[in-house]
Amino acid sequence: MLLRFTKMHGLGNDFMVIDLVTQHAHIQPKHAKQWGDRHTGIGFDQLLIVEPPSRPDVDFRYRIFNADGSEVEQCGNGARCFARFVLDKRLTVKKRIRVETRSGVIELDVRPDGQVCVDMGPPRLEPREIPFQAENAALDYQVEVDGCEVELAALSMGNPHAVLRVENVESAPVHELGPKLEHHPRFPQRVNVGFLQVVDRQHARLRVWERGAGETQACGTGACAAAVAAIRQGWMDSPVLVDLPGGRLSIAWAGPDQSVMMTGPAVRVYEGQVRL
């Protein structure tokens, strides 16, 4: 059978989006891996699946697969594209949408200027909720990599993140240290790794090594995690402008137990069909 799909991106973080509300198919990890190949498939960082809700208090269910076929809990840039997609496809007329993910419910607000604001919920800081192997929650942790101690913050934005402060993101060891931390045994579900440069109290630069995808042009949950880590450390004040290789996100966080608010663009690239 042929499935309709839409190619989208949020700051260069690119997605294949499939509507399983009006189409019916059983998509498996092998399909994500096949379609995600940039040489022989469609090519993407993540595959986003739009499904009917499984509970009455939400509008849709949102599933995410990395290009390596692994299913993950959350994707911030994908959430913005999800909101734009369901409106463009007239799957809803609501401008504020409640969406069920593997890690909980998020709220998406499509603004008149086309920007999408995502209520990502509060960050999770307890090690068992990240998950991260540590006895107690702390502002930062020491993790041993190749015999050296690496200082990082660890938290969850619905998916696990490590955040390292660097002097300059251009020279940060993203491709050397990123995969080593991604697969570090203290992160039992692997981890996304952010390399954060603080420019001033409300402006940062960030590169992210995403688990299952490698370095991407942008990572929404990574920007949220970096902003939360920087605010908790006292390095920055909310709201924070985060510049990623693909563009800029605005992140606001009022403090403990408060939701992280992420605002940025979502762009449709093209429509297509793929054989299942």
From Swiss-Prot:
Record site: Could be important to modulate the pK values of the two catalytic cysteine residues: 161, 210
Reactions catalysed, as given in the entry: (2S,6S)-2,6-diaminopimelate = meso-2,6-diaminopimelate
Any single Pfam family the record assigns to this protein: DAP_epimerase
Ligand binding (substrate): 13, 46, 66, 76-77, 159, 192, 210-211, 220-221
Disulfides per UniProt: none
Family: Belongs to the diaminopimelate epimerase family.
GO molecular function: diaminopimelate epimerase activity
Name of the gene encoding the protein in the UniProt record: dapF
Record-level GO cellular component terms: cytosol
Name under which the protein is recorded: Diaminopimelate epimerase
Subunit architecture: Homodimer.
UniProt KW Protease keyword: no
